[in-house]
Amino acid sequence: MISIANLSKRYGAVNAVQGVTFSCEPGTITGFLGANGAGKSTTLRMLTGLTRPDAGSATIGGKAFTELANPARTVGVMLDTSALHVGRTGRETMRVAAMIAGVPAGRADELLAATGLAGAARRRVGTYSLGMRQRLGLALALLGSPSALILDEPANGLDPEGIAWIRGLLRDHAARGGTVLLSSHLLAEVQATADRLVIIAGGRIVAQGTLRQLLAGTGQNLEEMFLSLTSLTSGGSR
């Protein structure tokens, strides 16, 4: 389970995240939606120990990310695939990560095949397309067979076949009792994939629940509801 309670972060005069509270239950996929600058990235960075919150807490399986003895065994994280080492091959990237996580090297090769990168495993990551880097980032997230996944824009750069593939993978993970937190700007894909939605605007949560709950009585579709909620709050977050 992923739990975020009263999480806040301020950068100078900017309240990037203000009192954010939500949870992601095992066996479900939670879609985390927000416009650029709404506070999604800052929230995910605090959840994964990359940014220290000013207030509040964020836990995965009851522990803060920084308290996990071997994070890769508990949570798979994919935030920014542009940060991958461009001079390493796909296989080198996976095997170094496997060594750090304490998992067999064979697991790295298994995931390269599962994500469709076996044929490109000996190529340097710097030659990969955006879609290939996304697949590699997902393979890294899955390396330790974690129960929870935190993924930021995992469908970026993927073609329709790739998007359908990742949707199936995430649904299978949730069906086996896993917890998925998925950040995306692709509303239609989130609608097709997620069980619950959390919408952030101006650093605050403005709506959360199932799609049916959020749309009940509004006469709107997801896009219309999202735009109406996010347009009420001006930008300024990260």
Residue map of PLM features:
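A short, surface-exposed alpha-helical micro-motif characterized by mixed small hydrophobic
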Residues: 190-192
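Helix-to-loop junction immediately C-terminal to a conserved catalytic motif
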Residues: 48
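Catalytic Walker B motif of ABC-type/P-loop ATPase nucleotide-binding domains
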Residues: 149-153
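Conserved ABC transporter NBD signature motif
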Residues: 24, 56-71
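ABC ATPase "signature
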Residues: 208-209
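Conserved ABC ATPase "signature" region
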Residues: 95, 99, 105-120
